[in-house]
């Protein structure tokens, strides 16, 4: 449902942010 879509989007955003942070280190 919508909640699952939001959860998936949140995970994608978290993954992108994490990768950006790791690249900076």
Curated annotation (Swiss-Prot):
Domain of life: Eukaryota
Keyword Secreted set for record: yes
Keywords: Amidation, Amphibian defense peptide, Antibiotic, Antimicrobial, Cytolysis, Hemolysis, Secreted
One GO BP: defense response to bacterium
Any one Gene Ontology cellular component term annotated for this protein: extracellular region
Localization, UniProt: Secreted
Modified residues (Isoleucine amide): 25
Chief location of this protein within or outside the cell: secreted
A Pfam family it matches: Antimicrobial15
Tissue: Expressed by the skin glands.
Family per similarity comment: Belongs to the frog skin active peptide (FSAP) family. Ocellatin subfamily.
Function: Has hemolytic and antibacterial activity.
The protein, known as: Ocellatin-K1
